[in-house]
């Protein structure tokens, strides 16, 4: 996957197109991610022993990783990410548009 936990991403398709958020959780096997404040769903929760409160709660649902782009602070927009190996052998992600290191 071209993104990982704690990256800032922008949604490029779907009902939340244009929203920006931080990745809370990544699910590599299913190629899905959970982004803060994106794809909110309503869930009816029963009271349990651990959490006494029940009721209707809103929480983030997973979206496919192809629906997001990494956010480049310098370019102030979403960019595609590529990989590059530096002279010291370190592998980093770079912006395909500007060539700047994103990590």
UniProtKB/Swiss-Prot annotation:
CC per GO annotation: ribonucleoprotein complex; ribosome
GO biological process: translation
InterPro entries recorded: KOW (IPR005824), Rib_uL2_dom2 (IPR014722), Ribosomal_uL24 (IPR003256), Ribosomal_uL24_CS (IPR005825), Ribosomal_uL24_KOW (IPR041988), Translation_prot_SH3-like_sf (IPR008991)
GO molecular function: rRNA binding; structural constituent of ribosome
Swiss-Prot/TrEMBL keywords: Ribonucleoprotein, Ribosomal protein, RNA-binding, rRNA-binding
Keyword RNA-binding: yes
Keyword Ribosomal protein attached: yes
CDD domains: KOW_RPL26
Pfam hit, one: ribosomal_L24
Coiled-coil positions: none
SUPFAM superfamilies xref list: Translation proteins SH3-like domain
Complexes and interactors: Part of the 50S ribosomal subunit.
NCBIfam families in the cross-refs: rplX_bact (TIGR01079)
Main function: One of two assembly initiator proteins, it binds directly to the 5'-end of the 23S rRNA, where it nucleates assembly of the 50S subunit.
HAMAP family tied to this protein: Ribosomal_uL24_B
Family: Belongs to the universal ribosomal protein uL24 family.
Protein name, UniProt field: Large ribosomal subunit protein uL24
GN (gene name): rplX
């Amino acid at each position: 996957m071209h993104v990982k936990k704690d990256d800032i991403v922008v949604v490029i398709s779907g009902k939340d197109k244009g929203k920006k958020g931080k990745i809370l959780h990544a699910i590599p096997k299913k190629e899905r991610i959970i982004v803060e404040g994106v794809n909110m769903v309503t869930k009816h929760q029963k009271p349990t022993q651990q959490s006494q409160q029940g009721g209707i709660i809103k929480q983030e649902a997973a979206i496919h990783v192809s629906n997001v782009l990494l956010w480049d602070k310098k370019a102030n927009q979403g960019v595609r990410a590529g990989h590059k190996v530096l002279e010291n052998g370190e592998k980093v992600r770079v912006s395909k548009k500007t060539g700047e290191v994103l990590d």
